[in-house]
Amino acid sequence: MGCDDKCGCAVPCPGGKDCRCTSGSGGQREHTTCGCGEHCECSPCTCGRATMPSGRENRRANCSCGASCNCASCASA
């Protein structure tokens, strides 16, 4: 599976709470965390994630980060 450049989640998101990348040829998997320390799920971060678009869309996973989210991957230009 391909991974994005934010948190290592599979793209497209497979659903569920397991968003991992295969590392090496042995099939071992590496659990990835986000800049804010939250575990990686469908969104690069889950801290204050909004369900409706808030102007800070995470276009990689079709999720939106809430206004209180200060993760680098949720930064808006």
Swiss-Prot record:
A molecular function GO annotation: zinc ion binding
Species whose genome carries this gene: Zea mays
Entry-linked Pfam families: Metallothio_PEC (PF02068)
Family assignment from sequence similarity: Belongs to the metallothionein superfamily. Type 15 family.
Keywords: Metal-binding, Metal-thiolate cluster, Zinc
Highest taxon, organism lineage: Eukaryota
Protein name: EC protein homolog
InterPro entries assigned to the protein according to its UniProt record, in alphabetical order: Metallthion_15 (IPR000316)
Function: Binds 5 molecules of zinc. May have a role in Zn(2+) homeostasis during embryogenesis.
